[in-house]
């Protein structure tokens, strides 16, 4: 299933994987998965985390390696009810709930994920997604960015 991904997608997922893989050992544990999900405002139980890992843990060792992670992401991308997931992701970024993601909100979430971005990098991300040029990202722009192939 992962063979349907573009090289660019694989590179993006590699970056995401390394955000999860806090100790850099090439695998994601339930603890690491929990840390990242909580930093995104989710609050999964230990059992839910274990289920998520078991779903994709092909070799049964209780952790997710990069090929398993790719399979999971490819499945998620095929999953068509992603509208709700995108809306949820938008809410994570839109801290004050005003319907827009500002540079400050984007920086805050990225910092929580362990990504230290310069102001210039944050502004660049906003510019790329900001279709109407108002300096922030509304929901429609966010959807466009998230679903861009």
From Swiss-Prot:
InterPro entries: CALM/Myosin/TropC-like, EF-hand-dom_pair, EF_Hand_1_Ca_BS, EF_hand_dom. The modification N-acetylalanine is found at residue 2. One of its GO terms (molecular function) is calcium ion binding. Ca(2+) 2 binds at residues 59, 61, 63, 68. The modification N6,N6,N6-trimethyllysine is found at residue 116. Ca(2+) 3 binds at residues 94, 96, 98, 100, 105. Keywords: Acetylation, Calcium, Metal-binding, Methylation, Repeat. Transmembrane segments: none annotated. GO terms for cellular component: myosin II complex. Ca(2+) 4 binds at residues 130, 132, 134, 136, 141. Residues 8-43, 44-79, 81-116, 117-149 form the EF-hand domain. Ca(2+) 1 binds at residues 21, 23, 25, 27, 32. It comes from the Eukaryota. Belongs to the calmodulin family. This protein has four functional calcium-binding sites. Calmodulin acts as part of a calcium signal transduction pathway by mediating the control of a large number of enzymes, ion channels, aquaporins and other proteins through calcium-binding. Calcium-binding is required for the activation of calmodulin. Among the enzymes to be stimulated by the calmodulin-calcium complex are a number of protein kinases, such as myosin light-chain kinases and calmodulin-dependent protein kinase type II (CaMK2), and phosphatases. This is Calmodulin.
């Amino acid at each position: 299933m992962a063979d349907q991904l573009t090289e660019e997608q694989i590179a993006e997922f590699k970056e995401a994987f390394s955000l999860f893989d806090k100790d850099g050992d090439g695998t994601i544990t339930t603890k690491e998965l929990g840390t990242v999900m909580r930093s995104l405002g989710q609050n999964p139980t230990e059992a839910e985390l274990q289920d998520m890992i078991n779903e994709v843990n092909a070799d049964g060792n209780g952790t997710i390696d990069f090929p398993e992670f790719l399979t999971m992401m490819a499945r998620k991308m095929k999953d068509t009810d992603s509208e709700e997931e995108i809306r949820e992701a938008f809410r994570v970024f839109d801290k004050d709930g005003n319907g827009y993601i500002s540079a400050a909100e984007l920086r805050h979430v990225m910092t929580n994920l362990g990504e230290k971005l310069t102001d210039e990098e944050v502004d660049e991300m906003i510019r790329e997604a900001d279709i109407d040029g108002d300096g922030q990202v509304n929901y429609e722009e966010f959807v466009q960015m998230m679903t861009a192939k």
